[in-house]
Amino acid sequence: MLASIAARRLIPCAASLLLLLALLAHPAQAQSDAPGGALDLGTIDFPTSASGEARTEFLTGVLALHSFWYPEARDHFRRAQALNPQFAMAYWGEAMTHDHPLWDQHDNDAGRAILAQLDAVRDASGLAWTDRERGYVDAIRTLYTGEGDIETRRDAYAAAMQRLAEQHPDDDEAAAFSALAQMSVEGFDLEDADDVVPVAAQLEELYRRHDRHPGVLHYLIHVYDSEPFAPLGLRPARTYAEVAPASSHALHMPSHIFRQLEQWERVVASNQDAYQASVDWQQRTDRPIHMRDFHSFGWLMDAYLALDRFDDACGLIQELESLLATAEQRGEDLGRMPSLREHFTSQYESAAAGTDAAGACAVVQ
């Protein structure tokens, strides 16, 4: 059935929805048994050539990767390398943290440097990897060292991951990362059934096997993040934050669906939780203030204004002003906070125009 869905390239959106709903009629039964480490990021079943603490650090890194928590994932992959320098997949994981495809961010130099480090270990003392793990490394090489521009290399990477998933049909991680890669190719249209249905079908099959897989839930929300498909995203949206509550991004992601459906109070709740989780992480790890989740902070502003909660919106502007002052006093990089302050102020005044709230948000700059 899934093969026939993927093969049909010209089907109307209504028919696509019916086909997907047929997939949703079968709830998942399988559960993973791999530990997620100290952070509550969900569980996965990902056999590796490493064991012990190196394996635990690696699995936590992959879980963070599934929630686009790239700095945290990088820390865990580096710890896995330190514990087991011959563990090839630990280098694969760190290379993965330098590509943020759905955010259009890619650090090619950093990725190539990690692969060069892996090659140096291979040449000096050899690597511990299986043929399947070698397939992961070969795939990521196409993204960083392949021919052509980044769009061409994304196409090649997506094809390589799809081959890996087909060669190892029991590897849920290969299938999940393959689906993400397909969404990342140039021209992928979230409102086009021809693009959405094959990827969604692949993810729905994974969901049937493991309905609490954090990557599957995350990527389902992304693939359904458009007006025609948003109702299908409610299922993963209701679960993802519960599965990976340590991740600010996991707490934020359900609001993509809630926003499409104009469920603004739920957008508020999601992004309050998401921003606070990022504050906890930033303070616990002693990182600069600009590394907080200001994306969720911005969505919180949008939701407050949509609900005419002008006092709350003004409170965000004042909080941002206070954070800027603190960061400047510490001599920290301000990141996008100054531009966000200007955007918030303009956004507030535009939304409040013609109301008693106009001009009422006094901020000393």
Task: Describe the residue ranges of each PLM region.
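Bacterial N-terminal signal peptides
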Residues: 12-25
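Amphipathic alpha-helical segments of tetratricopeptide repeats
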Residues: 82, 119-120, 162, 166, ...
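Residue-level recognition of tetratricopeptide repeat
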Residues: 53, 86-88, 171-174, 212-214, ...
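Structural register within alpha-helical repeat arrays
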Residues: 53, 60, 94, 138, ...
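Short, charge-rich amphipathic alpha-helical segments embedded
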Residues: 75-107, 167-176, 213
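Inter-helical turn/loop elements of alpha-helical hairpins
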Residues: 69-75, 94-130, 138-152, 185-194, ...
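TPR-adjacent "capping" and linker segments in tetratricopeptide-repeat scaffold/adaptor proteins
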Residues: 42-56, 125-133, 285-288, 332-340
